[in-house]
Amino acid sequence: MRALPAEVATAIGQKTKVGVVARPVINMSQNDAKAYTEWLSAKTGNVYRLPSEAEWEYAARAGTVTPFSSGKTINSSWSNYGNKKGKTDWVGHYSPNGFGLHDVHGNVWEWVEDCWNNGYAGAPSDTNVWQASDCRLRVLRGGSWVNDLQSVRSAYRQAFEPGNRNFNVGFRIARTLP
């Protein structure tokens, strides 16, 4: 089994302790996130990965067509955004969306697998990863605790270099079912 890279293990170890509510893991590049999913897949025998952009948005919307899974707007009692707290909040602190997912709006940006594309023209019509266009940039979704309301909408997306780390960037994993 491939070892988890030391910098990824250190970052995750600092944020997760058994029986302790944790803050999201931050300062993670897409490369770090993918290394973690490869390690977890090898360790468990299940297939873990970053979600595609389409999967992420579908999960964030939770069956809605509104800007937020909770409706047309959101406030700080439902999400950590707008630098109101000055830091990340505990994982699961806010109410889940209709699919049971917590913290999809704000708290930390989340990596997805897709390459950056300026728009949706030519996007896959299913949930497949979009590998066309500019793969020197990848996609972040969800916004973070420092972003404004516009940037934490379900549809908002941001380009970022896959090797870069930032204080407000983390990841959420998906599991491929057998």
Residue ranges and their predicted role:
Residues 3, 136-139, 176:
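Acidic/proline-rich low-complexity IDRs
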Residues 10-158, 162-167:
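Functional-site microenvironments in short loops/helix caps that host divalent-cation chemistry
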